[in-house]
Amino acid sequence: MAGCRELELTNGSNGGLEFNPMKEYMILSDAQQIAVAVLCTLMGLLSALENVAVLYLILSSQRLRRKPSYLFIGSLAGADFLASVIFACNFVIFHVFHGVDSRNIFLLKIGSVTMTFTASVGSLLLTAVDRYLCLCYPPTYKALVTRGRALVALGVMWVLSALISYLPLMGWTCCPSPCSELFPLIPNDYLLGWLLFIAILFSGIIYTYGYVLWKAHQHVASLAEHQDRQVPGIARMRLDVRLAKTLGLVMAVLLICWFPALALMGHSLVTTLSDKVKEAFAFCSMLCLVNSMINPIIYALRSGEIRSAAQHCLTGWKKYLQGLGSEGKEEAPKSSVTETEAEVKTTTGPGSRTPGCSNC
């Protein structure tokens, strides 16, 4: 409760406009602050660029936009992009520059970080369910998972993520409830509720992926039986196996990147944390940013359709740049006065058109 009294004194001094989220949360040394600034900046920029590239490839391809699977992947890329920008900026401002915000602005920032990471996990769950339906009900998959239903599922997931994440901004804060030792103004009971919600999402992902990977194993066995003869639908089976392995890799990366931070959050609910543990949590939190950075790499390396879209996009840009180069050569200055005078006589004759009009 001492933290609550400190908050009340701080907020009451200037109506909350000079709210400083407790110095006890700003525990990094100068060397650690430099490391956080460098790592967050580099990983945040790289992750943002990667996810923007994935979003652009999906949105610019009419074929990919029509497929529910890539709508879910696009949602994941969008959530990871927002997480990269919002988390990296706010993390550096808080731990490195010790930024001062009003109470509501601070809760808005931490709620935005929570929403983006929650939506990322939610998008991964929807992607897993999509693969589950594709492998378990292939004849009726297209009827079950339509583009409209995919958009509705994504809308519900994003709204639910936002609602849960912004509960502290809507009034669910600490004081008189016990404050979290890891997050200013966040009560332990809210943190417990959010951890339970994330645990449900992870349980769904693990169960779904386990079943998907088991089905993929069956498909591999089926491929081995028919490897010496052509079988209708064999290419589709190989696609499903490849996607299942990709999603299994994503799940493994997700658990490796998230488990340390989630474990320390749960540990903070039952015991008092030392500064060393809080410092460890600060760096473990950046593993979530690593997850956002790795996801698009996995898709780019393992999704043939996204690679094809990237090659098509690069070919288009190459032709465009070559066209600009050829236009520059055509507009090079004349080599002699006689050549220039001859062109002037030609363009000023009856019925002549200027170069600008000829392009219209």
From Swiss-Prot:
It holds the Pfam family 7tm_1. The modification Phosphoserine is found at S335, S336, S352. The modification Phosphothreonine is found at T338. Its main location: membrane. Residues 349-360 have a biased composition (Polar residues). The keyword Glycoprotein applies. It is a multi-pass membrane protein. Expressed in spleen and brain by neurons and glial cells (at protein level). Expressed in lung, testis and thymus but not in heart, liver or kidney. Expressed in cerebellum, cortex and brainstem. Glycans are attached at N11. Residues 327-360 are annotated as: Disordered. Residues 60-71, 130-149, 215-246, 302-360 are cytoplasmic. Signal peptide: none annotated. PROSITE patterns: G_PROTEIN_RECEP_F1_1, G_PROTEIN_RECEP_F1_2. GO terms for molecular function: cannabinoid receptor activity; G protein-coupled receptor activity. It is found in: Cell membrane; Cell projection, Dendrite; Perikaryon. Residues 1-33, 93-104, 173-188, 268-279 are extracellular. CDD domains: 7tmA_CB2 (cd15341). Heterotrimeric G protein-coupled receptor for endocannabinoid 2-arachidonoylglycerol mediating inhibition of adenylate cyclase. May function in inflammatory response, nociceptive transmission and bone homeostasis. Belongs to the G-protein coupled receptor 1 family. PANTHER family: G-PROTEIN COUPLED RECEPTOR. This is Cannabinoid receptor 2. It comes from Rattus norvegicus (Rat). The gene is Cnr2.
